[in-house]
């Protein structure tokens, strides 16, 4: 089960929380002795976040033909099931939940090939998660067209990309057009679009079929 609680004390080692609903029966029946804690920032969803959510919902609605309200409810439910969190309202959820939900909607668009009215770079509320998703789905971080992996550190002349360890290297997903622009303009390119390379972890290396030593 998922329960919400209020923090009532913390001394640096011991955290005391007060559940907002009675959970005694569940604790006794399941003999729970360990819990998972998810911290939120305490601030409510911003108007800008809400605009991003509804813009993404409208894009998905236009793509599949369902009403926006149905899409909002469906994606909210799927997000909560996937993340294992309580249902929430866009009227008063916290900013952390809104941020993660926006990232989920963006990933949904990438997974299903949903065409969007604007680049998802302008819709993201968490640039690092967005850049990771762009790499995972091979979508350009700038325009969202089909992309290749652009290494921030050059691999080097004469080196076989299939034989080097890519794990830990910084990379970004860019289409051919923006790949050329990145090579031509260098750091000015990244400053222009407010993007950057992220480190390839083992999961990304596996998804992208890049060699890793471990």
Residue locations for each model-derived region?
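Conserved aromatic-histidine-acidic binding/catalytic patches
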Residues: 45, 89-97, 128-131, 162-166
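General detector of N-terminal leader/presequence modules that precede the first folded domain
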Residues: 1-85
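Short cysteine-rich loop/turn motifs with clustered Cys
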Residues: 125-152, 177
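Polybasic, low-complexity binding patches
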Residues: 163-169, 180-214
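Phospho-dense, intrinsically disordered low-complexity tracts enriched in Ser/Pro and acidic residues
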Residues: 2-20, 34, 155, 195-214
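Charged, alpha-helical interface segments at or near domain boundaries
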Residues: 74-118
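Histidine-centered nuclease catalytic patch
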Residues: 139-171, 187-188
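Short Cys/His-rich Zn2+-coordinating modules
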Residues: 118-130, 153-161
């Amino acid at each position: 089960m998922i329960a919400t609680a209020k923090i009532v004390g913390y001394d640096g080692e011991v955290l005391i929380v007060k559940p907002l609903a009675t959970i005694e029966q569940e604790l006794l029946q399941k003999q729970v002795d360990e819990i998972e804690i998810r911290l939120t920032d305490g601030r409510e969803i911003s108007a800008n976040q809400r605009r991003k959510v509804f813009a993404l919902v409208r894009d998905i609605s236009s793509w599949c033909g369902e009403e926006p309200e149905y899409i909002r409810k469906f994606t909210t439910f799927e997000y909560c099931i996937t993340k294992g969190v309580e249902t929430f309202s866009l009227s008063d959820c916290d900013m952390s939940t809104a941020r993660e939900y926006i990232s989920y909607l963006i990933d949904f668009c990438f997974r299903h090939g949903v065409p969007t009215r604007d680049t998802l770079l302008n819709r993201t509320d968490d640039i690092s998660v967005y850049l990771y998703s762009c790499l995972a789905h091979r979508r350009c971080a700038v325009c969202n067209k089909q992309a290749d992996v652009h290494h921030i550190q050059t691999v080097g002349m004469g080196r076989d990309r299939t034989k080097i360890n890519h794990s830990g290297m910084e990379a970004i997903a860019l289409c051919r057009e923006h790949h050329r622009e990145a090579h031509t303009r260098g750091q000015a390119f990244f400053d222009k679009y407010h993007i950057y390379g992220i480190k390839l972890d083992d999961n990304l290396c596996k998804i992208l079929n890049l060699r890793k030593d471990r």
